[in-house]
Amino acid sequence: MGSHPIEATNWSFECVNGTDCGSNGLWITTTSQPGTMRLWDSGTSWAILNNAAGTYSWTNLDISLDLIAEHQPRAVIYTFGHGPCWLASTACSGSGSASSGKYWSPSPPTDLTTTGSPSFNAFVTALVQHCSPAGHCVKDYIKYWEMWNEPNLTHYWNGSIAQLYNMFKPAIPIIRNHVTGAKISTPPVSGGDTAWIASWMALENANGRLSDYYGFHVYLWNYAPETRINMIGHMVTAKNTNGWTTTPWMNTETNFSVDTNLCSTQYTKADCEGQIVRWHVLQFAYQGGAGGAFHVGWYNWPSISSGGYDTYYYTMMQWLTGATFTASCTSSGTVWTCPLTEASGKTALIVWNAAGDSDYTPATEYLDYKKFNGTYGGATETISAGKVTAIGVSPIMFETAK
């Protein structure tokens, strides 16, 4: 993960606890196989793994570790979050329908001071030293670590930004000392909260860098990708403004909508299929400091199958793995173009019309184009130089001879 050209690990899937992958002991069944697994919501949170002082329940993590070991090569992201109720400064109610305050707490640990939380440090130490009964160890398989899921939302964290920094400052060296090659991401904020993440970066700048990556979560939320990329731009601009221009950035959690993980009914099926591809391409191509996205992760992976998107995701990965985008996507009206160099060395251009069907005249050096057609891998059509070609909401990729 974290490379240009794009690798398979630059995509990730997440298996929500109780769905048909992850803690039930089953691997994802899609033909498309992202190279990274993100463990958030897989039943491996702090509150679940550390259910009492000095007591650990590793069952769910062991299931994931053993599955990951069986499906190599594979990168893994662990995201901290969900404070345990036994350590909460605000007591959990133990009732109600909301998980926050019932099964876990958003409040800081009771033992958190300006020098950290001994209980959190103990959990982190136990976590990075843990191995499953089959001998599959955290230190060998989990190399990417996110500091606290969406802490700008008070149902995930209701302490101050400074308190969160204080909790992680002594914990990050524990990870680095036990996990060779560990990479740390900022706490991934949601909803384009540039003010929160700017305050976090200011703390790192003033008191010591903790992060190797800059992470956030941006869902489409019923917007077209061509509109939603503006929020990505705002987040990347905030990174650069705070002196982090060369820091790689990641959108480690996305989908259509947060609440349903479904494409809006305002769009046609063809548009929804195209949006999966357009959303990823726009991010991987966005050249806003440190190049395009180093990672894009899809939340609730079974929604790829239930939505009928597996052939599109698979074909997209086939197109982009090994490729390097040479510039951000640009638009002329509703027609978007994204230049790239493929793994083969061919010069290519991804093109679509977000508004629907139209004609497009490619430059004369393009001699064929790849398209999505509902099959794994799609199809390739040969064209004569400068041939007028039909485009639409599903991207096509023009290619040169080499």
Task: Give the residues covered by each predicted segment.
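Boundary/entry segment of secreted carbohydrate-active catalytic domains
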Residues: 1-42
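Well-ordered, non-membrane alpha-helical segments in soluble/globular domains
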Residues: 19-25, 54-63, 120-122, 164-170, ...
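Substrate-binding cleft and catalytic face of glycoside hydrolase catalytic domains
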Residues: 32-211, 215-221
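Substrate-binding surface in catalytic domains of secreted glycosidases
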Residues: 211, 218-249, 257-273, 278-279
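Aromatic/acidic polysaccharide-binding cleft in carbohydrate-active enzymes
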Residues: 251-335
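Carbohydrate-binding surface patches
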Residues: 331-367
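Solvent-exposed beta-hairpin/edge-strand motifs
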Residues: 364-378
